[in-house]
């Protein structure tokens, strides 16, 4: 059997030590970007990466294979703090559209909440995936639509990044 590469790898759950062990969608993105094999590729927006890692690990194998194209789409999506913050806010709003936040007497008063730190992006992503009532074709399309929305937030913010415009032909082979 030949060596595993971005064209022959099969997406699977979890974190992997090497491509020979398999890859999640973000590990594939790191391969496509020419980065060190990792589920936290430098060239990918942390908000989008967290969402795709959580989603990759929560869906069945058939739907997971639909994420191949997104591995290439997200390479070069890392942007400035303003875009990252806008993406995190959209992810939070999307989550609340599916499952409004619970109100309890234990919540901080509004004036104190303004000083509370925002949750890390991996928590926001996990909450978004947990807000899905089921993993079916409808919710699958919704999550993929959200990824497109998050990518668009970066595209509208200004000219494309050097990383995005310098993609190799192998990235386009997947889309």
Language model: regions and residue ranges:
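Leu/Val/Ala/Ile-rich N-terminal alpha-helices, chiefly Sec-type signal peptides and the beginnings
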Residues: 6-50, 58
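Structured binding/interaction patches within domain cores
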Residues: 37-175
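Active-site-adjacent bridging/hinge elements
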Residues: 1-5
């Amino acid at each position: 059997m030949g060596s595993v590469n971005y064209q022959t790898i099969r997406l699977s759950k979890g974190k992997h030590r090497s491509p020979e062990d398999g890859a999640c969608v973000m590990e594939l993105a790191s391969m496509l970007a020419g980065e060190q094999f990792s589920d936290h590729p430098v060239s990918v927006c942390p908000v989008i990466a967290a969402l795709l890692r959580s989603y990759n690990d929560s869906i069945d194998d058939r739907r997971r294979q639909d994420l191949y194209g997104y591995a290439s789409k997200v390479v070069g999506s890392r942007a400035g703090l303003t875009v990252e913050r806008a993406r995190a806010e959209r992810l939070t709003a999307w989550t609340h559209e599916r499952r409004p936040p619970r109100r309890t007497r234990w919540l901080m008063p509004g004036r104190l909440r303004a000083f509370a730190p925002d949750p890390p992006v991996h928590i926001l992503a996990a909450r978004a995936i947990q807000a899905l009532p089921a993993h079916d074709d409808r919710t699958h399309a919704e999550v993929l639509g959200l990824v497109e929305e998050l990518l668009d937030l970066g595209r509208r913010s200004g000219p494309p990044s050097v990383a995005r415009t310098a993609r190799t032909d192998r990235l386009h082979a997947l889309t």
